[in-house]
């Protein structure tokens, strides 16, 4: 299924697109700098791009952790990014988020993985009529996402993406099964792979999550080779000082070489076609 986002279309057989940005809005200056650099990189690569940042991280490990600037200031900053840099915006919403207020600013709404089974929430977000990126829960088998998508589609909104971000594998660990990407295609939705949250070690530092960012390129290449519509990566100029998800964020300075590789891989895979679709 093809989906229109701003001025480009996304889909399995279309060129790879990027969702990227810092995990959380730390400051207007940082957000503008990161968004500007990502726009420059993706323009050079002719890669469609959606900027991502959160105004409120509601599921932090500790109540003392930084959550973001809040909705009022956060939306003001995201709107400035959108208007100044002319890039589409995605941000995550929660059960107590005033959805219409957010939908009036951003181009895509994102539902957190932990909330993918909350039926009323999924329906409410989809009912806004905006494109929605539904992140698959770390506790869900890929084929179970068909039912989540069905809840969203029941509102009449067919502009739904599904995002794989790893599966719980023991304590404080996630694992990525590349077969899940092919299974998620059966939802008929564009499939996204979150290469940075997939290397997260949830709660691994006790009061915060750990991560293994050195494996981001490995999983990003594998997912692109498996066949996806888009790649999701959180990035930061100095991940070790990021206020959220630093251990699994990919350094901004290393985004371009990684994206160059992914673009070439994507081209080869999609030009060759997907043999698994005719394997039976």
Curated annotation (Swiss-Prot):
It catalyses: D-arabinose 5-phosphate + phosphoenolpyruvate + H2O = 3-deoxy-alpha-D-manno-2-octulosonate-8-phosphate + phosphate. GO terms for cellular component: cytoplasm. It comes from the Bacteria. Pathway: Carbohydrate biosynthesis; 3-deoxy-D-manno-octulosonate biosynthesis; 3-deoxy-D-manno-octulosonate from D-ribulose 5-phosphate: step 2/3; Bacterial outer membrane biogenesis; lipopolysaccharide biosynthesis. Its EC number is 2.5.1.55. It is found in: Cytoplasm. InterPro entries: Aldolase_TIM, DAHP1/KDSA, KDO8P_synthase. Keywords: Cytoplasm, Lipopolysaccharide biosynthesis, Transferase. It is an enzyme of class 2 (transferase). GO terms for molecular function: 3-deoxy-8-phosphooctulonate synthase activity. GO terms for biological process: keto-3-deoxy-D-manno-octulosonic acid biosynthetic process. Coiled coil: none annotated. Pfam families: DAHP_synth_1 (PF00793). NCBIfam families: KDO8P_synth, PRK05198.1. HAMAP family: KDO8P_synth (MF_00056). Belongs to the KdsA family. This is 2-dehydro-3-deoxyphosphooctonate aldolase. It comes from Coxiella burnetii (strain CbuK_Q154).
């Amino acid at each position: 299924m093809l989906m229109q986002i701003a001025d480009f279309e996304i889909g399995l057989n279309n060129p790879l697109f990027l969702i990227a940005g810092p995990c959380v809005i730390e400051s207007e200056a940082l957000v503008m700098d990161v968004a500007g650099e990502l726009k420059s990189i993706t323009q050079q690569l002719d890669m469609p791009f959606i900027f991502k940042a959160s105004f409120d991280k509601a599921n932090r490990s500790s109540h003392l952790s930084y959550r973001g600037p809040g909705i009022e200031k956060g939306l003001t900053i995201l709107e400035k990014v959108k208007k100044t840099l002319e890039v589409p915006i995605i941000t995550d919403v929660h059960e107590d988020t005033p959805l219409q207020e957010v939908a009036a600013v951003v181009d895509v709404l994102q539902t957190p993985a932990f909330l993918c089974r909350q039926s009323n929430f999924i329906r409410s977000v989809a009912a806004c009529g905006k494109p929605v990126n539904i992140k698959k829960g770390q506790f869900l088998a890929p084929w179970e996402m068909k039912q989540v998508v069905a809840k969203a589609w029941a509102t009449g909104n067919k502009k739904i993406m599904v995002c794989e971000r790893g599966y719980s594998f023991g304590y404080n660990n996630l694992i990525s099964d590349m077969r899940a990407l092919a299974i998620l295609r059966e939802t008929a939705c564009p499939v996204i792979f979150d290469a940075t949250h997939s290397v997260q070690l949830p709660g691994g530092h006790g009061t915060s999550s750990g991560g293994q960012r050195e494996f981001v390129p490995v999983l990003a290449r594998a997912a692109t080779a498996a066949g996806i519509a888009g790649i999701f990566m959180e990035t930061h100029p100095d991940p070790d000082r990021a206020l959220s998800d630093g251990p699994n964020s990919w350094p901004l300075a290393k985004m371009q070489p990684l994206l160059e590789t992914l673009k070439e891989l994507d081209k080869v895979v999609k030009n060759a076609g997907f043999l698994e679709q005719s394997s039976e």
